[in-house]
């Protein structure tokens, strides 16, 4: 998910469930067919591309990451949480020391995309229930502004209420 610039990075970590997309992206599996249009390019007139020429470049993962893996960045240690639902290889990153959650696309304070071709509501529910149990203080979602752990629990409870799942 959100991989249009992944080829720019020397290191590309991904969950195995989405590794093939990085290696062989196309308009369907990247959602570019549905979400990328000429208006995006017209907003940047210096850009020499147009929609008809746009392609997400292939660049395979350099490392596969699984639930429970630890990413030690020196001053920050993040635990990988596999949080499928929005997409099958969705991950969140949990920093226990600061009680900070980088939730990606599974949760943010705005309309959640849960009906893409690769979304799965049962997985979504399981992932949200798992996140709700964490002692989160701050959430940095994949979209919109960051929010508190209390707001996270409110958003998750509202999602379950709206879907009548418990």
What are these regions (language model features)?
Residues 56-57, 70, 77-163:
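Metallo-beta-lactamase
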Residues 1-70, 161-162:
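Active-site HxH/HxHxD metal-binding segment of metal-dependent hydrolases
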């Amino acid at each position: 998910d959100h991989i249009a610039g992944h080829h720019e990075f020397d290191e590309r970590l991904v969950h195995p469930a989405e590794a093939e997309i990085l290696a062989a992206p196309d308009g369907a599996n990247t959602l570019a067919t549905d979400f990328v249009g000429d208006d995006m390019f017209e907003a940047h007139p210096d850009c020499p591309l147009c929609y008809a020429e746009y392609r997400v470049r292939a660049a395979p993962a350099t490392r596969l990451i699984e639930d429970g893996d630890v990413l030690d960045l020196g001053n920050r240690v993040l635990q990988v949480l596999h949080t499928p639902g929005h997409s099958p290889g969705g991950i969140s990153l949990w920093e226990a020391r600061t009680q900070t959650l980088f939730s990606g696309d599974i949760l943010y304070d705005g309309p959640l995309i849960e009906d893409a071709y690769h979304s799965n509501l049962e997985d979504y529910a399981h992932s949200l229930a798992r996140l709700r149990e964490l002692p989160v203080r701050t959430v940095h979602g994949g979209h919109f502004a960051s929010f508190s752990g209390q707001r996270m629990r409110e958003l998750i409870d509202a999602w379950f209420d709206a879907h009548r799942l418990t």
